[in-house]
Amino acid sequence: MVSSKLIAPLSDELAKEYGMKRIGIRKDDTVRVMRGDNYGFEGKVTQVFPESGRIAIEGLTRKKADGTPVYIKIHASKVEITKLNTNDPRRKDIINRKASRQKEEQGGKAQ
């Protein structure tokens, strides 16, 4: 189960392709930072921290006092998903279910 803290909006291209606006972030998704000092940085999600609602992005690090690099944790609401990892069949089912539900809602509003 994906924590409600870990839901992020899809990019405009993905939103049109999949017919939904947001989905839970998973490891190996590609995201773009949309707020803060690291605005515009794009990379692959390496770790997900459901308890704090934050993620670690490949290449987004800082150095500790002793010189070892550590990931900068970014809140999931401050990123935009640019590429989905669809290797998991359960996630494909979630995407299909959300997309069909979205189409039904749009069809009902048009009438």
Swiss-Prot record:
Keywords: Ribonucleoprotein, Ribosomal protein, RNA-binding, rRNA-binding. It comes from the Archaea. The keyword Transcription does not apply. One of its GO terms (molecular function) is structural constituent of ribosome. The gene is rpl24. HAMAP family: Ribosomal_uL24_A. One of its GO terms (cellular component) is large ribosomal subunit. Gene3D superfamilies: 2.30.30.30. Residues 88-111 have a biased composition (Basic and acidic residues). One of two assembly initiator proteins, it binds directly to the 5'-end of the 23S rRNA, where it nucleates assembly of the 50S subunit. It comes from Metallosphaera sedula (strain ATCC 51363 / DSM 5348 / JCM 9185 / NBRC 15509 / TH2). Part of the 50S ribosomal subunit. GO terms for biological process: translation. CDD domains: KOW_RPL26. Belongs to the universal ribosomal protein uL24 family. This is Large ribosomal subunit protein uL24. The keyword Cell inner membrane does not apply. Residues 85-111 are annotated as: Disordered.
